Amino acid sequence: MIQDYLIIGIFLIASFIFGMVVLLTASLVRPKKPNKEKLSTYECGVETTGSTWIRFKVSYFMYGLVFLLFDVETVFLLPWAVKFKSLGLFALFEMVIFIGILIIGLWYAWKEGALEWK
């Protein structure tokens, strides 16, 4: 069993080293000739007008986080529902605890006003 983890660890270390070598090689080999054209903001092939830096409302981020939370819940809940009969009572209690934690998180987000549009 330790050998399995050793193989995974070696693979992770090797992939990390490979990624660093590729990034380092690319930064050493690339041409370094910055000019105004290369440093300008490019958006869909059209010259930008006005300021390219805009204020981003954090409420979009909070809605995205809550959506991601319940999207992950669906990823765990659907396979569990398919195998519900064969998993037994212990899996039911595990899922009740999981959903309970998510409900507490939703309640906290609601209480903090993360779901209100301001």
From Swiss-Prot:
<keyword id="KW-0472">Membrane</keyword>
<dbReference type="GO" id="GO:0005886">
    <property type="term" value="C:plasma membrane"/>
</dbReference>
<dbReference type="GO" id="GO:0048038">
    <property type="term" value="F:quinone binding"/>
</dbReference>
<dbReference type="Pfam" id="PF00507">
    <property type="entry name" value="Oxidored_q4"/>
</dbReference>
<dbReference type="GO" id="GO:0030964">
    <property type="term" value="C:NADH dehydrogenase complex"/>
</dbReference>
<keyword id="KW-1133">Transmembrane helix</keyword>
<dbReference type="GO" id="GO:0050136">
    <property type="term" value="F:NADH:ubiquinone reductase (non-electrogenic) activity"/>
</dbReference>
<dbReference type="InterPro" id="IPR023043">
    <property type="entry name" value="NAD(P)H_OxRDtase_bac/plastid"/>
</dbReference>
<comment type="subunit">
    <text>NDH-1 is composed of 14 different subunits. Subunits NuoA, H, J, K, L, M, N constitute the membrane sector of the complex.</text>
</comment>
<protein>
    <recommendedName>
        <fullName>NADH-quinone oxidoreductase subunit A</fullName>
        <ecNumber>7.1.1.-</ecNumber>
    </recommendedName>
</protein>
<feature type="transmembrane region" description="Helical">
    <location>
        <begin position="6"/>
        <end position="26"/>
    </location>
</feature>
<keyword id="KW-0812">Transmembrane</keyword>
<keyword id="KW-0520">NAD</keyword>
<comment type="function">
    <text>NDH-1 shuttles electrons from NADH, via FMN and iron-sulfur (Fe-S) centers, to quinones in the respiratory chain. The immediate electron acceptor for the enzyme in this species is believed to be a menaquinone. Couples the redox reaction to proton translocation (for every two electrons transferred, four hydrogen ions are translocated across the cytoplasmic membrane), and thus conserves the redox energy in a proton gradient.</text>
</comment>
<feature type="transmembrane region" description="Helical">
    <location>
        <begin position="61"/>
        <end position="81"/>
    </location>
</feature>
<dbReference type="InterPro" id="IPR038430">
    <property type="entry name" value="NDAH_ubi_oxred_su3_sf"/>
</dbReference>
<comment type="similarity">
    <text>Belongs to the complex I subunit 3 family.</text>
</comment>
<keyword id="KW-1278">Translocase</keyword>
<feature type="transmembrane region" description="Helical">
    <location>
        <begin position="87"/>
        <end position="107"/>
    </location>
</feature>
<keyword id="KW-0813">Transport</keyword>
<dbReference type="InterPro" id="IPR000440">
    <property type="entry name" value="NADH_UbQ/plastoQ_OxRdtase_su3"/>
</dbReference>
<keyword id="KW-0874">Quinone</keyword>
<keyword id="KW-1003">Cell membrane</keyword>
<dbReference type="GO" id="GO:0008137">
    <property type="term" value="F:NADH dehydrogenase (ubiquinone) activity"/>
</dbReference>
